[in-house]
């Protein structure tokens, strides 16, 4: 809902500046998606016309009495930290000739949505809102996925978080290019896996990772784990027992009192929730 965007603290704080600048500025990516799904989000990314990013971010920092941070001087990405040092907004130059071109370079249609802050309208050039409504994760193009293979794993992370289905073509792409994850930085893979494990639909997602032959590219040891039969205490082989452990943790969480839920929703080291780490710890104990 557009009202969710306007009601956000960060958006309300910068709107007077945006309107006074009289230049198009677009919120892009996950923030727009999450607002349309009625989910809380504080990850605000803004795109401005090519070449305007540095000046725009500098002026916004001055307006907010905040701080200007240069994140990437090659790709012209900047961060404006609010004076409270808790909130921030990232600002980048448009990567295409227009915002429409920029959006077409993104990974999935549900992430290729922009909100024009100046005109207060949503820009959707790849039918992302339809896919959002229908719960579909759809590729914009195969090239966009292969251009940065971590997007293969991002697809599964979004499935875990939202419970969406993959488009038929995306399933083919994910399976076809799974091998490219073998050369992707382990640090990037770890970030996505931790987020995936923290999703409400983690078990179904891992099952799909396995079905599309992506899991064994991420964790080669899984091939041997599947060969370990159940012992006298269990009725499932080690692989499916691990999945069942995760499923039971979720059931425990869903049926817990509010106080317990709040405890597991708290973030600990790495910015991840305790619930995510509990699933990992229990899985490791069962595999030892």
Regions found by a protein language model. Name each.
Residues 1-288:
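Catalytic cores of the polymerase beta-like nucleotidyltransferase superfamily
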